[in-house]
UniProtKB/Swiss-Prot annotation:
It is found in: Secreted. Disulfide bonds join 24-42, 35-63, 48-52, 67-79, 80-85. Postsynaptic neurotoxin that binds and inhibits neuronal nicotinic acetylcholine receptors (nAChR) with high affinity (IC(50)<100 nM). Is a selective, and slowly reversible antagonist of alpha-3/CHRNA3-containing and some alpha-4/CHRNA4-containing AChRs. It comes from Bungarus candidus (Malayan krait). It comes from the Eukaryota. PROSITE patterns: SNAKE_TOXIN. CDD domains: TFP_snake_toxin. One of its GO terms (cellular component) is extracellular region. Residues 1-21 form the signal peptide. This is Kappa 1b-bungarotoxin. GO terms for molecular function: acetylcholine receptor inhibitor activity; ion channel regulator activity; toxin activity.
Length: 87
């Protein structure tokens, strides 16, 4: 009986995740915000457009469910899973 009760408690904790959600820096202001449910990965993407040599790369930060694929116009792409790690 104790084993069954312990199993139920563990399953409940895992399923509910104790209400914890990820916080990531969100562009354009780079302020920490709580990510929507299911989006537990922070990302930082720097990409170049035709004005990159003048103003530098365009920076995008946010929350995603899966890390975006790297593309040829990206200068860098960072995906991470700790709070506010995308700086």
């Amino acid at each position: 009986m104790k084993t069954l009760l312990l199993t139920l408690v563990v399953v409940t904790i895992v399923c509910l995740d104790l209400g914890y959600t990820r916080t990531c820096l969100i562009s354009p202001s780079s302020t920490p915000q709580t990510c929507p449910q299911g989006q537990g990965i922070c990302f930082l993407k720097a990409q170049c457009d035709k004005f990159c040599s003048i103003r530098g790369p365009v920076i995008e930060q946010g929350c995603v469910a899966t890390c975006p694929q790297f593309r040829s116009n990206y200068r860098s792409l960072l995906c991470c899973t700790t709070d506010n790690c995308n700086h």
